[in-house]
Amino acid sequence: MSVYRGALALLVCLFAFSATALGAPTLKKAPNDAVTCTLPDSNAEALVILSNFYPGYWWDHTDLTIAVQAHPSATDEQLDAISDAIATWSSTLEDCFGGLITLTDVTGSKRQAADIVVHFVPTAGGVVFGGYALCGDHGCPNILVRSDLPPSLDREPNDPEYLGWVTLHEIGHALGLGHTTNLLESTDLMGYGWPDLGDPVLSDCDVDALAFVFAWAINGTEPAPPGEGPYDCSLD
């Protein structure tokens, strides 16, 4: 069984004081009208909206870029897993928002800094975390994912499939999604129930919550932080 717990700071946000600005936009249409794809349901009850707790933790543009910076020891299989996770989010956004919200992999490009940067450091985190998204003022330059556990635990490194799942989860944080409110039992991608209770599910609620996060873009208005969460998955 793999050991993974995401950033502890994001767990604390479940009960933190909300810093959402008054007058934040809400969707003028139901999320299922704004989203143009059909994804599986999950057992998530609601999703925390991170900008409610971290001012500036939202995007003021929708043409997002992402890049990978990997440790020299990274294997091809590990790099492929991270790349596949990015491609999954990229294609999901394209399918679900019709090009309105995009995520482009610019790994290796020197033209400009990416909005989101995934750092793969095999031994980072010790026993504390398997992935961590440190985001802030309209940017997320520090997603950290790892594969190797400390030797004292006497466990094999996490396999590439699991590394890909962690990367998917952390990119979800970078886009603005917090954890599920039923955190420990949920197998939604943004929960902690996987893999013990089943494979993670990139769900209908995840993309509907992103429609909530990017309400300003969907409504065609000026950029503004999301409304008050958590996003209730029963609304989709």
Label for each model-derived stretch:
Residues 1-8:
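Bacterial N-terminal signal peptides that target proteins for export
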Residues 9-18:
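Bacterial N-terminal signal peptides
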Residues 66, 89, 169-172, 190, ...:
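Divalent metal-coordination and catalytic microenvironments
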Residues 21-77, 216-236:
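Disordered inhibitory propeptide/activation segment of secreted metzincin zinc metalloprotease zymogens
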